[in-house]
UniProtKB/Swiss-Prot annotation:
Pfam families: DNA_mis_repair, HATPase_c_3, MutL_C. CDD domains: HATPase_MutL-MLH-PMS-like, MutL_Trans. The keyword DNA repair applies. One of its GO terms (cellular component) is mismatch repair complex. PANTHER family: DNA MISMATCH REPAIR PROTEIN MLH, PMS, MUTL (PTHR10073), DNA MISMATCH REPAIR PROTEIN MLH1 (PTHR10073:SF12). This protein is involved in the repair of mismatches in DNA. It is required for dam-dependent methyl-directed DNA mismatch repair. May act as a 'molecular matchmaker', a protein that promotes the formation of a stable complex between two or more DNA-binding proteins in an ATP-dependent manner without itself being part of a final effector complex. Keywords: DNA damage, DNA repair. One of its GO terms (molecular function) is ATP-dependent DNA damage sensor activity. This is DNA mismatch repair protein MutL. NCBIfam families: mutl, PRK00095.2-4. InterPro entries: DNA_mismatch_repair_CS (IPR014762), DNA_mismatch_repair_MutL (IPR020667), DNA_mismatch_S5_2-like (IPR013507), HATPase_C_sf (IPR036890), MutL/Mlh/PMS (IPR002099), MutL/Mlh/Pms-like (IPR038973), MutL_C (IPR014790), MutL_C_dimsub (IPR042120). Belongs to the DNA mismatch repair MutL/HexB family. The gene is mutL.
Length: 603
């Protein structure tokens, strides 16, 4: 068959296959056009999941009759000149959207430029263009798309249900609304009540308002501002505290120069930043905005413009990781406050008041043991003086501690320890409320941060076992551990082969105190079996540290003396990220006295 030039309609339908994947693709292209036209208000209406009808109305600059005629021609655009492809500043730039849509649907455009006496209208059906006619429209542009894919019915078979397609449209509009909080959006149709997002004030406060309107009040209450800047690249936005997570990455909204993207490099940076805060099966919720010189990023690498390529990808990744880690460390205490508010909402009265006629005479009951009395002993350096008291598995040692009056300790951020309940939770008193601490989770974070700091400094201090501990395991597990023995040694865990199916543990990290070496090695081996061979060394080391921290922490069920509890509180105050354990759960919750008084009707 000889080579021949394809008809224009066929060319447009081929292009439509890349640009117009589903109704949501149409909405994305048309809303981006409205934003590029300088609109301050955009209204979106859909019916039948966008199959039957899509309507977009904006108050942007509009088009003249001449521009309208060119707008439905392929690769005709006002957003690009000969030299601009390497510095794209608009959301659209190829000039493909309108002709592609018109080739597979019934397209109607009505537009009015500010300098025109009236509006102009044009229709395109299956690639066939009508004459441009005068029309009525106050200002801006109205685009209607009816019977999507009627000209290519085979494409209809690949669409989902109306409800699924409508949800995809909703997600597209949500992302574009996040990118432009200065623009008002309305989304209507699909037998739903219209959703309106009013234009927000400029600046960070306006952005948070828009994000809260879209992502909900829970995100707003957990939101932490992110800002980092280096060499002309700015990373800004809001990330939720680790207490708010999802089972997938759908809650991560990423933008580059105002363009919604799904970029693997940025997603990888987000995972790295949260690696110390979340378990591997949980994902953070955030909206990050990367702003940089358009010449430093290529937006023309994907048909749907959802991917970008950075000239200096390493710097962008490092800046995102730095900005997120700094924000999370700075706002670590807010997790506790938010968790306390959530806990308060579930409180209910534990009894029903008796009628006045009931007999209120006391009934026999078992005597209640008196609460322990103490003056609030505190250890100024938990990891040094108090370590003996926290040796895992050891009884409470006779350790001497310096003491401070309770009245002094209540002014500390985590207050003065008052009691321990269920041998698991420490209750402390602050000047304006109380704090409940999960002793294992808190100590786990302290040990983890201590291991990291030691590794970054002069190495982890180790303790030599007088009698090496022999741990028997299957040969595959032993081999896996011995292959990583150098990495384990960097954390003070020295092992060597002890014949088939066994290893000898000769040294353990001092921070762990007395630990179950066998259990630690088995857990380490299980985690190593899940590692990807391409996992960077730093990430592998952090996984080792996290596992060691879990084993080296005071356990739930361990009774603590007052001085031990205060020692833990003081060390938490000095430890970075102490508001969450290594798995992302809060280490403590804070209840204000005013909130407690509300529970008892005092306020």
């Amino acid at each position: 068959m000889p080579v021949r030039q394809l008809p224009e309609q066929v060319v447009n339908r081929i292009a439509a296959g890349e640009v117009v994947e589903r109704p949501a693709s149409v909405v994305k292209e048309l809303v981006e056009n409205a934003i590029d036209a300088g609109a301050s208000r955009i209204d979106v209406f859909t019916d039948g999941g966008g199959r039957r009808r899509i309507g977009i109305t904006d108050d942007g600059s509009g088009m003249t009759a001449k521009d309208l005629a060119l707008a439905v021609e392929r690769h005709a655009t006002s957003k690009l000149d000969d030299e601009d492809l390497l510095q794209i500043r608009t959301l659209g730039f190829r000039g493909e959207a309108l002709p592609s849509i018109g080739s597979v649907a019934r397209l109607s455009i009505t537009t009015r430029h500010a300098g025109e006496p009236h509006a102009w209208a044009l229709t395109v059906e299956g690639g066939e263009k009508s004459e441009i006619m005068p029309a009525a429209l106050a200002h801006g542009t109205r685009v209607e798309v009816n019977d999507l894919f009627y000209a290519t019915p085979a494409r209809l078979k690949f669409l989902k249900t109306d409800r699924t397609e409508a949800e995809a449209i909703r997600e597209v509009v949500r992302r574009l609304a996040m990118a432009r909080p200065d623009v008002a959006f309305t989304l209507a149709g699909e037998e739903r009540a219209p959703v309106t997002w009013a234009a927000a004030l400029p600046g960070a406060a306006g952005r948070l308002t828009r994000l809260g309107d879209i992502l909900g009040a829970e995100f707003r209450s957990h939101a932490i501002e992110v800002h980092a800047e280096r060499e002309g690249i700015v990373v800004s936005g809001y990330a939720a505290a680790p207490a708010l997570t999802k089972a997938n990455a759908l809650g991560q909204y990423l933008f580059v120069n105002g363009r919604p993207v799904r970029d693997k490099l940025i997603l990888g940076a987000v995972r790295a930043a949260y690696s110390d805060y979340l378990p591997r099966d949980r994902h953070p919720v955030l909206a990050l905005f990367v702003t940089l010189d358009p010449r430093e990023v290529d937006a023309n690498v994907h048909p749907a413009k959802t991917e970008v390529r950075f000239r200096n990808a390493g710097l962008v990744r490092a800046l995102i990781v730095h900005g997120l880690k700094e924000a999370l460390a700075r706002e670590g205490r807010r997790t506790a406050a938010n968790s306390g508010e959530s806990a308060l909402s579930s409180f209910r009265p534990a009894f029903t008041p008796r009628p006045a006629s009931w007999d209120w005479r006391a009934s026999p009951s078992a005597p209640v043991a008196p609460m322990p009395s103490f003056d609030g002993a505190a250890a100024p350096a938990f990891t040094e003086r108090a370590q003996a008291a926290f040796d895992v598995g050891a009884p409470s040692a006779d350790v001497r501690f310096e003491t401070q009056p309770v009245s002094d300790l209540v002014d500390r951020p985590l207050g003065a320890a008052r009691t321990q309940i269920h041998e698991t939770y420490i209750v402390s008193q602050t000047r304006d409320g109380l704090i409940i601490v999960d002793q294992h989770a808190a100590h786990e974070r302290i040990v983890y941060e201590g291991l990291k700091a030691s590794l970054a400094a002069n190495g982890v201090q180790r303790q030599i076992l007088l009698i090496p501990e022999i741990v028997e395991m299957d040969e595959a597990t032993v081999e896996r551990l011995l292959e990583r023995s150098d990495e384990l040694a960097s954390f003070g865990l020295a092992i060597e082969s002890f014949g088939p199916g066994a290893v000898a543990v000769r040294e353990t990290p001092s921070l762990l105190g007395k630990t179950n070496a066998g259990g630690l090695l088995r857990d380490l081996s299980e985690h190593m079996a899940e590692w990807d061979e391409a996992l960077p060394l730093e990430r592998r080391l952090m996984h080792v540290a996290a596992t060691m921290a879990c084993h080296g922490s005071v356990r739930a069920g361990r009774r603590l003396r007052p001085e031990e509890m205060n020692a833990l509180l003081r060390e938490m105050e000095e430890t970075p990220n102490s508001g969450q354990c290594n798995h992302g759960r809060p280490t403590y919750v804070e209840l204000k006295l005013s909130d407690v008084e509300k529970l008892f009707g005092r306020r």
